[in-house]
Amino acid sequence: MSKDMKYLVLENYIGGKFVPCSKLIDSFDPSTGEVYCKVPDSGAEEVNAAVRAAKEAFPDWSAKSPADRSKVLNKLADLIEARLEEFVQAESKDQGKTITFARNVDIPRSAYNFRFFASSVLHHTNDCSQMDHMGCLNYTIRCPVGVAGLISPWNLPLYLLTWKIAPAVATGNTVVAKPSEMTSVTAWMMCQLLEEAGFPPGVVNIVFGTGPRAGDALVSHPDVPLISFTGSTATARLITERSAPHCKKLSLELGGKNPAIIFADADMEQCISTTVRSSFSNQGEICLCTSRIFVERSVYPEFLTRFVEATRRWKTGVPSDPSNDNGALISKEHLQKVKGYITLALAEGAQVHCGEGVDKLALPQQNIGGYFMLPTIISGVKDSSALMQEEIFGPVTCVTPFDEEEEVISRANNVRYGLSATVWSRDVGRVHRVARKLQAGLVWTNCWLVRDLNLPFGGMKHSGIGREGGKDSYHFFTEVKSVTVKH
């Protein structure tokens, strides 16, 4: 950004070049509520150009060996790590998350996504069988699909964008990606590194803009046979409808209403500290955050008291202050939506123990217009309430007692979502038993957010379609072909 410019102005990255866009969208600094960046408002014209560039690059890129592609991915990881602090500062300012979270989670994981898939693509095996009575040998081949359309969300901007780009290009596809228009800066910064990393023009194309314009043009494009999307269930329905006429491969990672089940024999100290983190990390703007907490009745009073005390020690404030645990929510509209659930809770007779409407948040004068909200704990909520049924996606969690194991499993499953769950107990038999019965794609016991990227990631029910990670990403971003050779 030049000194005479008021705003940072982003450009699309198409065919190895930065391309200005005549239409621009305001992007806000969540910590101040002020415009600080202009993002392309791309539409069909820009998406079409990106798809053409990706199609032209596909034959040569897909013909490269996995080892050659792996070297390019590792080089990009090196370049991101070399500029780690620049990416950290940009991600924090653009998204509102704390600089500590961006430094410890977002940017290191973004680089690691490239390293992980650079390695894993070298170690996949295919199937083979011999039919002696027919004199035939059968084997499978995995081939890249073509141009991959990738749409990533605003909560973990570079982290989830690279989670999609890395396996797509590692397996030989070319990419047209659309990050969220609210958090586009680190994707734009990554584009500045692609040529140096060794990506030929057109292998990775980034088109910025809104879902209704750029996103719709991408998912409905006849030359994009594959879509990977992370975001809301409502948007996923539209993507499914728009892509259906073209029979596209879809991977949809959607919302969650994730339960924590805390039995009386849980390690209470570890459980409380982890549940504070699982409920409120990144302002509660993680699809895996805990938003329903079921506590066995005999320890419910103790848990609730200690949980409220621990949550009040969780600091909310200016994202650039490394002592803060939470920063600002993504937008004014989202803040109002989340606060609306507190209004609903009070109208339904629930009790707010801490946070919104109970405690005061002191902010510097320049941040008064920012989108801040204290972590909020609510009790006395019915299972049928919107607070227990809908994804809030903010620093709000509900706590409720339970009596029996089968009862709490039934209540935990009684939502339309099925992304993740946590179970707290020292009884190994119980945690295995409960994990098997929970309708969730990921179940953590006595921990949260421990991830082996080799294992499948995704949800059940309205939390998504398909899985990604390790061999699941390899399978999604390739097509399998069976070959029979008679000898």
From Swiss-Prot:
Any one Gene Ontology BP term: L-kynurenine catabolic process
Tagged with keyword NAD: yes
Coiled-coil residue spans: none
EC number: 1.2.1.32
Chemical reaction(s) catalysed: 2-aminomuconate 6-semialdehyde + NAD(+) + H2O = (2Z,4E)-2-aminomuconate + NADH + 2 H(+)
Pathway: Amino-acid degradation; L-kynurenine degradation
Matches recorded under Gene3D superfamilies: Aldehyde Dehydrogenase, Chain A, domain 1 (3.40.605.10), Aldehyde Dehydrogenase, Chain A, domain 2 (3.40.309.10)
Subcellular location: Cytoplasm
Domain of life: Eukaryota
Top EC class of this enzyme: oxidoreductase
Positions of the catalytic residues: 253, 287
PROSITE patterns: ALDEHYDE_DEHYDR_CYS (PS00070), ALDEHYDE_DEHYDR_GLU (PS00687)
Role: Catalyzes the NAD-dependent oxidation of 2-aminomuconic semialdehyde of the kynurenine metabolic pathway in L-tryptophan degradation.
UniProt protein name: 2-aminomuconic semialdehyde dehydrogenase
